[in-house]
Amino acid sequence: MILKNTIKNASLLLKNSFIKSHLLDAEIIISNIMNVKREFLLLNDDMMISKSIINKYNDAIKRRLKKEPVAYIVGKKEFWSIDFPVDKAALIPRPETELLVHEVTEFYKNKKINILDIGTGCGCILLA
């Protein structure tokens, strides 16, 4: 099957299940399975993909249709340009937290402070 058609079909399934980020999710999942960046998908959209990739992709899309977060499906979440491994045992980093870290670092830019991270997630705040 052709890559762009595979993504389009999966995106439509997700859209019909009221998943707002349907195209983004479809692209993130297939790029993770193929171990390529999302830009690769745009540059190679007429590429034929193997049956094994399609099977893995279909399984992952079924998980997303059940509203499982993309981060759990792909096993990672980006935070401050760093990929952090995530699973159901850790909270997924949220964009709001990224903004909070940015604002705190800007506010205390020239001040010495102590911060305690009590480990409720994947460690992204501490490491970022």
Q: Could you describe each region identified by the protein language model?
A:
Residues 14, 24, 41, 91, ...:
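Generic leucine side-chain signal with a strong bias for well-ordered alpha-helical environments
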Residues 1-34, 41-42, 46:
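Non-catalytic accessory regions of SAM-dependent methyltransferases
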Residues 96-128:
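Conserved SAM/SAH cofactor-binding pocket of Class I
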Residues 7, 38, 112-114:
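Secondary-structure boundary/capping motif
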Residues 32-107:
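Conserved AdoMet
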Residues 7, 26-27, 57, 70, ...:
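A general structural signal for well-ordered alpha-helical segments in protein cores
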